[in-house]
From Swiss-Prot:
GO BP of this protein: 'de novo' pyrimidine nucleobase biosynthetic process; 'de novo' UMP biosynthetic process; amino acid metabolic process
First-tier enzyme category under EC: transferase
Family: Belongs to the aspartate/ornithine carbamoyltransferase superfamily. ATCase family.
Disulfide bond positions: none
Gene: pyrB
Subunit structure of this chain's protein: Heterododecamer (2C3:3R2) of six catalytic PyrB chains organized as two trimers (C3), and six regulatory PyrI chains organized as three dimers (R2).
Pfam families: OTCace, OTCace_N
SUPFAM superfamilies: Aspartate/ornithine carbamoyltransferase
Protein name, entry field: Aspartate carbamoyltransferase catalytic subunit
Organism name: Helicobacter pylori (strain ATCC 700392 / 26695)
Task performed by this protein: Catalyzes the condensation of carbamoyl phosphate and aspartate to form carbamoyl aspartate and inorganic phosphate, the committed step in the de novo pyrimidine nucleotide biosynthesis pathway.
Length: 307
């Protein structure tokens, strides 16, 4: 029988008290990446973490690598394009072979939503889901929450705030994880997209970006995930941007909360998802999200490997 260990496959794996602890620890690291205690560094020194990414990544894989190194751990990144997976080895066999080398944690990303849950059934080390299909990306939701926590000052202040997700919500694991987490914390949610990009959920929806902007205290723009579309929804990304881009003009004309903040999980399609001028605006928290990704992943790794 595999021994019991903690995994992070979805945000519901964490209690609210554990989420608060992660926010507190990550806030310390966000203020100073070098604020890792000597005791933590000593305990992490001999830890070996494997990053097993079957899909492309820039921010997430780099963020986990930097987080691991800042804690004092070692990380091994596997290039799946040159691995035995490209020769026909199954996901399960690849994982079991890596698992047999006894790493202290495995971080995985896969196109199938069920992949991390299947692997967790026999994993004897902590498994972190760094993105699975369109269903879950828990550390992204946590770092987004950290960004909101910093801006609004507390979880209590977040209750009742209104957030609009604009873009390809249906195919976004980021949106899915964020929605589930933010509902637990009492935020009001609206989804804004063309019908083909909206999931079947009992939430407020609109096809009108101006309505979403007027509704929100927080705007979360999402990339159009054309790689997950069977047929084109718009003739071009420019046509999509004409309808859904967050622009200064739209913010000025329609935002009831003039201090509305703008988030995006990346990669951003400039002038398609968000206008370049808005990305440079102080209301944009996109680069803060990237920084907070390192801090939150430091907190998550420490929580799973040491606590």
């Amino acid at each position: 029988m595999p021994k019991k260990c903690r995994h992070l496959l979805q945000t519901s794996d964490l209690s609210l008290d554990e989420i608060k602890l992660l926010l507190e620890k990550a806030s310390v690291y966000a203020n100073d990446f070098n604020a890792v205690s000597l005791e933590t560094k000593e305990k992490m020194h001999n830890k070996i973490i494997v990053a097993l990414f079957f899909e492309n990544s820039t921010r997430t894989v780099s963020s986990f690598e930097i987080a691991s190194l800042r804690l004092g751990a070692k990380i091994v990144k596997l290039n799946m394009q040159t691995s035995s997976a490209s020769k026909g080895e199954t996901l399960t066999d690849t994982f079991k072979n890596i698992h047999a080398m006894q790493p202290d944690a495995i971080i995985t990303r896969h196109a199938f939503s069920s992949a991390p849950f299947k692997l967790a059934e026999f994993s004897q080390c902590p498994l972190i889901n760094a993105g699975s299909g369109v269903s879950a990306h828990p550390t992204q939701a946590l770092l987004d929450l950290l960004t909101l926590y910093q801006h609004f000052g507390s979880l209590e202040n977040l209750k009742g705030k209104k957030i609009a997700f604009i873009g390809d919500v249906k195919n976004s694991r980021v949106a899915n994880s964020n929605i589930k987490l933010l509902q637990r914390l009492g935020l009001e949610i609206m989804l804004c997209a063309p019908s083909s990009m909206l999931p079947s959920v009992s939430l407020k929806t609109t096809h009108n970006v101006e309505e979403a902007i007027a509704f929100a205290d927080i705007l979360m723009s999402l990339r159009t995930q054309t790689e997950r579309h069977n047929t084109p929804i718009f003739a071009s990304l420019k046509d999509y941007g004409n309808a859904y881009c967050i622009t200064q003009q739209r913010l000025k004309a329609h935002a009831k909360n003039k201090e509305v903040i703008i988030l995006h999980p990346g990669p951003v399609h400039r002038d398609i998802d968000i206008e370049s001028a808005v990305l440079e605006d102080e209301r944009s928290k996109v680069l803060e999200q990237v920084k907070n990704g390192v801090a939150m992943r430091m907190a998550v790794l420490e929580f799973l490997l040491l606590d």
